[in-house]
C-alpha cells in the first residue's frame, strides 16, 4: 500500500514495513528500504531523502517499486527456495495500465505468478467471511491516501468504489482544526 507493505503466508504475518525508499541526495543511490530506509533518514537527514513509490494505491515509480518488492520478498520469504505465487491487494479503481505495470514490477522482483484482488475483497477473504449466500456484505478499507469500498453478495462483487480520502486526509483535518481552534500558527 501507499503507507505499509505486509506479507502473509498461510495466515501468518511474515513482514510489515513502511513502503518507503531511502535515497542518497548526492548521487541518487538507493540506501535502504522500509525500516532500514527510516533509520538511514534519521541518521543523516541532510544527505538522505525518503521516496514513497506508491501514491493513492498506485505505483508512481517503477524502479523504486521493483526494488522495494524484491527486498521485501527476499526478507519476508527468506526460507523459501522457490519463486512465490503472490496475491496482491490493490484499489478497485486502479487502471488496467497501472495493474499491468504492477504485475510486471512484481514479476521482475522475483514472483513466479501474480494475482490481483481488490482491497475490499481481500479484507473479506482475510476475515474468513463466506460470500456464498444471499447476504450482503459491505467492506470498507481505509488506507493512507484512499478508501476502497466493496459490496458483495451471492459469491460476487455487486459494486465497488474508490474514494480519494484516507488516513492522511483525516490527520490533516484534525491538525487544521487544532491549529484553528487553539490559534496555533
Can you name each region flagged by the protein language model?
Residues 2-144, 152-185:
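Nucleotide/phosphate-binding catalytic cleft detector across ATP-hydrolyzing
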Amino acid at each position: 500500500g501507499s503507507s505499509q507493505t505486509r506479507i502473509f503466508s498461510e495466515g501468518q504475518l511474515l513482514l510489515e514495513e513502511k513502503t518507503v525508499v531511502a535515497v542518497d541526495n548526492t548521487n541518487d543511490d538507493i540506501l535502504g528500504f522500509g525500516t532500514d530506509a527510516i533509520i538511514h533518514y534519521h541518521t543523516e537527514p541532510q544527505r538522505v531523502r525518503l521516496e514513497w513509490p506508491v501514491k493513492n494505491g498506485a505505483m508512481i515509480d517503477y524502479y523504486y517499486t521493483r526494488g522495494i518488492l524484491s527486498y521485501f520478498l527476499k526478507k519476508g520469504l527468506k526460507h523459501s527456495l522457490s519463486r512465490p505465487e503472490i496475491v496482491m491487494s490493490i484499489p478497485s479503481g486502479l487502471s488496467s495500465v497501472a495493474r499491468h505495470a504492477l504485475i510486471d514490477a512484481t514479476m521482475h522482483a522475483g514472483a513466479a505468478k501474480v494475482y490481483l484482488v481488490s482491497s475490499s475483497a481481500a479484507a473479506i477473504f482475510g476475515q474468513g467471511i463466506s460470500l456464498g449466500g444471499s447476504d450482503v456484505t459491505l467492506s470498507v478499507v481505509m488506507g493512507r491516501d484512499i478508501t476502497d469500498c466493496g459490496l458483495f453478495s451471492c459469491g460476487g462483487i455487486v459494486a465497488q468504489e474508490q474514494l480519494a480520502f484516507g488516513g492522511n486526509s483525516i490527520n490533516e483535518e484534525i491538525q487544521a482544526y487544532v491549529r484553528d481552534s487553539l490559534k496555533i500558527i
